[in-house]
Amino acid sequence: MSDSAKHSITYLRFLHLVQAIRQIPTFPKMDPVEDRLLTMLGVKWHDAQQVSVLEAMGLSTEISATTAHRRLKTLRQKGMIELDIDKIDSRVKYVVPTELARKYFVALGQAIDKAAQPT
């Protein structure tokens, strides 16, 4: 089997596993915009960057600031993010992951590992 075929199969396995993860009742149902926003936030958090609400609203050129702000609210309601107030300027709030978001990222990472394993 060629490398490109192996990579294709691995990727499709990963997508299948992600769909299964999204059906687990432990994790809230997220629409594509929420999922994209959480993914972009996860990249920033992985790089140990603090992300203010204002910065989060501008993370993607594909998502309007208003839509991003609405989705931040819904992600907060779903228990995926929290807001921490800046210690110096109380007007600034930082978006931080909850334990549930961390578990979600772990589940996705495990899906990558599982998809890459030969069958």
Ranges and model annotations:
Residues 76-86:
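A short, conserved structural fragment
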Residues 86-109:
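Short, cationic-aromatic polyanion-contact patches
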Residues 41-45:
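Short helix-to-turn junction characteristic of helix-turn-helix DNA-binding domains
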Residues 11-40:
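Short alpha-helical segments that sit at the start of domains
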Residues 13, 18-22, 106-119:
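Amphipathic alpha-helical dimerization/coiled-coil segments
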Residues 47-59:
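Short acidic, hydrophobic short linear motifs in intrinsically disordered regions
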